[in-house]
């Protein structure tokens, strides 16, 4: 059985939702810290461009994946192991939002949101936990401040409450395995989610630094949650 080492250059981080936003920022910060990377998202072109930017084969590989597709998630995990023989950390980050108001969005968009944000994250866990057991690794999930407070009429908030529960459910289920579980809960962040940049929002890099902080802890330290708000955000 492999074990977690203190040297990031020997370790492999798999990121879903890696082609833009928080995922891409985290990939860049992790690469700078020496991690090898498996980059997963739907956009092959953007993934391959990012993988090349971060060192190409041997340092970063693209693993195109629709997280709502179980077979695609299995291939993603298999591709990661084929490339690097191990997975030491997984950042289940794929997700998106939508307008508030139960009459303001379409049922089709709701369905895609629930499948991506909740079902997709659950499939990522299922696909990668066997490898994380081998490495005694680290599982991180992107939830949100919206998963801690209720946003009126927000299906996005509903999905993030589910992610908050999923993180704790996974932590308890994996107790004793050596796998650490961290829930990342950003507040208002300037991501592709917004058409216009929110004033005083966090940057993707702010969230990426929080992820790297959790990953930098020694194996006996399990940072369960990191909730990050911009100083201008009250709720």
PLM region spans:
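Residue(s) in the substrate-gating loop at a strand-loop-helix junction
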Residues: 144
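Substrate-binding pocket helix/loop in short-chain dehydrogenase/reductase
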Residues: 101-103, 109-111
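Active-site helix of classical SDR
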Residues: 125, 159-160
């Amino acid at each position: 059985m492999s074990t977690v080492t203190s040297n990031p250059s020997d370790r492999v981080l798999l990121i879903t939702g890696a082609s833009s936003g928080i995922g891409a920022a985290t990939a860049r910060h992790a690469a700078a810290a020496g991690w090898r990377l498996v980059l997963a998202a739907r956009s092959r072109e953007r993934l391959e461009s990012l993988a090349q930017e971060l060192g190409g084969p041997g340092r970063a590989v693209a693993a195109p994946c629709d997280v709502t597709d179980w077979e695609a998630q299995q291939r993603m995990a298999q591709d990661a192991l084929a490339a690097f023989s191990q997975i030491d950390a997984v950042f289940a980050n794929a997700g998106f939002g939508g307008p508030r108001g139960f009459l303001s969005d379409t049922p089709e968009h709701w369905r895609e949101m629930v499948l991506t944000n909740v079902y997709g994250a659950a499939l990522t866990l299922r696909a990668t936990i066997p490898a994380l057991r081998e490495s005694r690794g680290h599982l991180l999930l992107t939830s949100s401040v919206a998963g801690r407070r209720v946003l009126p009429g927000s299906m996005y908030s509903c999905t993030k409450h589910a992610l908050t529960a999923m993180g704790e459910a996974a932590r308890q289920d994996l107790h004793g395995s050596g796998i650490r579980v961290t829930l990342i809960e950003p507040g208002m962040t300037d991501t592709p989610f917004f058409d216009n940049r929110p004033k005083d929002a966090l940057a993707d890099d702010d969230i990426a630094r929080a992820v790297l902080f959790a990953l930098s802890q020694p194996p006996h330290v399990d940072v369960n949650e990191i909730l990050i708000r911009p100083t201008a955000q009250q709720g």
